[in-house]
Amino acid sequence: SSFALGALLASVCLPAEAQVDLVKDGKTKSIIILQQDSRVNRTAANILRLFVERISGADMPVVTNKTARKGDVIIGSEAPMDVKEDGYALSTAGGILKISGKANGVVYGAVSLLEDYLGVDYWGENEYSLTKSENISLPLIEKVDNPAFRYRQTQCYAMKNDSIYKWWNRLEEPEEAFAAGYWVHTFDKLLPAEV
């Protein structure tokens, strides 16, 4: 009886096994599978691939029309019901990393994964920090996140020169959310001075 209790307590104290091993000893068998080959899915895949390579030196191929196996990444699968516009979901259930979202949320999910679980910080235009490692393992993740604001903007010039900065900080430009060419100093187009 006391042996069983001791064994139970010991098993609870053991470290949890990784849910998904993306890179082991600098090598990967994982692939990134796009559910649909869209601009946001491909952007999410390319950002994830870039930083996995910068961290570990391992290159994860991006493919379409493949069946996922344990250790793979699926980008763009159907988002859970509680994901709103630009929100995302991360899951490592079944040993497969799934990044899903609505609108730009898929990219924001990839960025959050890099930031929250792989320790990548993006500070400014082409300025980031990370810890190199030959191993990248993810714990059990079941996360849904929705942005507090519909529109996020800054006047930082880095947005024009560094697309990763823009995605990382979840920023938008006026022409992406409003009528292109009709912003601030263009009111003359809407209401000409002659009127």
Regions found by a protein language model. Name each.
Residues 1-4:
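Bacterial N-terminal signal peptides that target proteins for export
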Residues 6-10, 14-91, 124, 128, ...:
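Acidic, contiguous N-terminal accessory segments
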Residues 44-47, 51-53, 85-195:
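Feature activates predominantly on carbohydrate-active enzymes
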